[in-house]
Amino acid sequence: MKNLVILSGAGISAESGIKTFRDAGGLWEGHDIMEVASPYGWKKNPQKVLDFYNQRRRQLFEVYPNKAHKALAELEKHYQVNIITQNVDDLHERAGSSRILHLHGELLSVRSEKDPNLVYRWEKDLNLGDLAQDKAQLRPDIVWFGEEVPLLKEAVSLVKQVHLLIIIGTSLQVYPAASLYTHANKDALIYYIDPKAKNARLPQNVQCINENAVHAMQDLMPKLIEMASQEMLK
């Protein structure tokens, strides 16, 4: 099977009802990003940070994978698929995808504020006084602004091996994830799916699809399956 990597962002989850912080009506409206998603904000007002992520975690149980998530999972029948996602939700997992790299962490995980290796699955609200095994306060297992991205090297390695790369639902404005596609082999086929894709300044080898995730994947699926069956990728 050919290697296919999906780089997904907030746009694909927005179609399931998860609000995005870059949209005018998004969940982050009214919040200074650095107040709720940075080590500075955590030190200044941990309760505010916990309240913010508790709200986001609760929202997960009100939304479901959409047809784009399910289409990406379906591609595992035809390709060796790895998903690199900037999203912290679990919609790819619930859609049936099996190999997912969460670059920016996961809402359903928490960790010790002292030891990032002490990670726990967490579905309820997180409160001050909830402690890890090392007696440190638990914090959201999220990569905050100003923190290193621990899985970046693994993500780069996956992109370097691809025959096909699909970038979907991301504005390509959040670094370092936005530059991942530049590590693809020059012979790799790259699709960029986003309602504003044609406005992006991308290399000529990137094929832009100016649609939302659901419609684009419905249109693209037959071609992707045909390419896999006919070994059309180098």
UniProtKB/Swiss-Prot annotation:
NAD(+) binds at residues 9-28, 86-89, 169-171, 217. It is an enzyme of class 2 (transferase). Gene3D superfamilies: SIR2/SIRT2 'Small Domain, TPP-binding domain. One of its GO terms (molecular function) is NAD+ binding. Residues 1-234 form the Deacetylase sirtuin-type domain. It comes from the Bacteria. It catalyses: N(6)-acetyl-L-lysyl-[protein] + NAD(+) + H2O = 2''-O-acetyl-ADP-D-ribose + nicotinamide + L-lysyl-[protein]; N(6)-succinyl-L-lysyl-[protein] + NAD(+) + H2O = 2''-O-succinyl-ADP-D-ribose + nicotinamide + L-lysyl-[protein]. It is found in: Cytoplasm. Keywords: Cytoplasm, NAD, Transferase. NAD-dependent lysine deacetylase and desuccinylase that specifically removes acetyl and succinyl groups on target proteins. Modulates the activities of several proteins which are inactive in their acylated form. 2 residues (Tyr-53 and Arg-56) present in a large hydrophobic pocket are probably involved in substrate specificity. They are important for desuccinylation activity, but dispensable for deacetylation activity. Belongs to the sirtuin family. Class III subfamily. This is NAD-dependent protein deacylase. The gene is cobB.
